[in-house]
Design a protein with these regions (language model features):
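Carbohydrate-active catalytic/glycan-binding domains of CAZyme proteins
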Residues: 1-483
Length: 483
């Protein structure tokens, strides 16, 4: 039987010069937000390297990117004067920042586009504002429309008005999550007709004590001191298996479907120990948890590499401190996560250049959101046959609870035809393939639930299979095999 795997995507080299934006491609993108508009994919991202006013990149395949300019080329003072004045008032002096951070771009009702942006007075402080701008064309020009949230001081009691992300619930209600670090992640309901706050409240109402903190800033969806870059995605009909696949054979009667909201955030320092975490809930604005860590979330990814060590020449990059991702569904139904990633890994905690990475998304049989541990190369989820896995040897990456070290790949896991999982000839557990592409296995006493999917295996420069799994300890386990 012939199986379909992605061909060579001809990724552009991970290199770039800060002073040559026309040649950047994926280089320099930070905190990306994706949209499909006017026949192409667009990524809006934080300002960097002098292109400070929201960078825009264009792609026709989610693989190759070209720089398309800035959302506010005239700058903050000229384009966003009301935002600048509002932040200066709460800061009590002139601001110390000339960069726009972490945008989100969505279609506007009735046509055009809504750009949700943020501006902060100084790095490391919460004197910030989230604003709305609009444009008729995806590449702009964008025009200021309103300020939705203004914060400043009492960080912890107040949130930080940055990192806005928009989503819609199953009934079409519009929400915005935002916040970072000590103030936690908050949520506000917006009016889908206008893109503005549904309650119409302003900072003046809060400053005059007409309303309290929760009314103005929104309720907490996550109380955290180290999370930022929230994104929520609503998914219908996620398959969930209610049986114990290790104890007995798959029973079709034990499958069901569920509707869930998935919250992703990134935690810790963006240049040293950044890592991507995930929660889920039955409700859009509350109840997000992730066993076994609850409000701490399950780890979707931390720093890892398909190199087998720092000197391995087979692949020239690592997935170093990946984070601040968007969750995006393409017009053809393919679900991906877009995030920034630094490379290569440095044990000296040196800042590294950041790039736009995209990875395929999947779900395990517990309904948990997973990421392919490979860059997207045009693949789609499909049914995986047993002969694609049985008797095959895989490289693997086991990510631990620590976040400062890079988890390098190791070789030697074999999924035997008799259901045994072997490591270098020693039995370490068992494995199961069930449903269309679900894989469960045990390794050294821990149970893992994952999904198998096609992938471009960059370390081997060939197409193949990847398995992304999460253990009952909430930690990821990845396997790659090229054909």
């Amino acid at each position: 039987m012939r199986f379909e795997y992605p061909g060579d995507p001809h990724f552009a080299p991970l290199a770039g010069r800060a002073d040559a934006p026309n040649n950047w491609g994926a280089f320099g993108a930070h905190d990306p937000s994706l949209i499909f508009a006017e026949g192409a994919y667009y990524a809006f991202s934080t300002g960097t390297f002098g292109e400070n006013y929201y960078q825009i990149r264009r792609s026709h395949d989610l693989i190759h990117w070209e720089y398309a300019g800035q959302a506010f080329p005239a700058g903050i003072a000229a384009s966003l004067a009301p935002v600048l004045r509002a932040v200066e008032r709460v800061y009590g002096k002139g601001t110390e920042n000339d960069t726009l951070w972490a945008p989100d771009i969505v279609p506007a009702q009735g046509g055009g586009y809504w750009l949700y942006g943020c501006y902060t007075a100084a790095f490391g402080k919460n004197y910030s504002a989230i604003f709305l701008a609009n444009a008729q064309n995806i590449e702009g020009p964008y025009i200021y429309a309103d300020t939705l949230v203004l914060t400043g001081g009492d960080w912890g009691l107040q949130p930080n008005a940055i990192d806005a992300q928009i989503f819609y619930d199953g009934e079409g209600r519009m929400f915005m999550t935002y916040g970072s670090f000590y103030g936690g992640i908050r949520i506000l309901e917006l009016d889908p007709r206008t893109g503005r706050r549904k309650d119409g409240l302003t900072y003046r109402d809060f400053a005059a004590r007409k309303v309290g903190r929760e009314a103005y800033f929104g309720r907490h969806v996550l109380r955290s001191s180290n999370a930022e870059g929230s994104v929520v995605a609503y998914k219908r009909g996620v398959p969930v298996y209610r049986g114990d696949i290790f104890a007995r054979a798959e029973d079709a009667r034990l499958w069901s479907q569920t509707d869930r909201y998935y919250l992703m955030c990134s935690a810790d320092s963006l240049s040293q120990d950044y890592n991507m975490r995930v929660w889920s809930s039955e409700f859009p604005d509350r109840g997000y948890t992730a066993p076994p860590y609850g409000f701490a979330g399950q780890k979707a990814a931390g720093s890892f590499s398909w190199r087998r060590g720092a000197e391995d020449p087979r692949i020239g990059f690592d997935f170093f401190v990946p984070g601040h991702n968007d969750l995006f569904t393409a017009p053809n139904g393919v679900e991906v996560a877009a995030y920034h990633c630094r490379t290569p890994y440095s044990d000296r905690r040196e800042p590294r250049a950041h790039y736009l990475f995209v990875s395929l998304c999947a779900y395990n049989s517990k309904g948990e959101l997973l990421l392919s541990p490979n860059r997207y190369a045009g693949e789609r989820l499909r049914k995986i046959e047993r002969e694609e896995l049985s008797g095959k040897t895989f490289d693997y990456v086991q990510i631990g609870s620590g976040n400062f070290d890079c988890a390098y790949a190791k070789s030697g896991i074999c999924l035997e035809g008799n259901g045994s999982l072997m490591l270098c000839g020693e039995k370490m557990g068992e494995w199961k393939l069930y449903g269309d592409n679900f894989v469960a296995f045990t390794f050294d006493g821990m149970r893992y639930f994952g999904a198998a999917m096609p992938a471009w295996i960059e370390a081997e420069a060939r197409g193949g299979i990847t398995i992304s799994a999460r253990g009952e300890d909430g930690l990821p386990f990845f396997l790659n095999r090229a054909f």
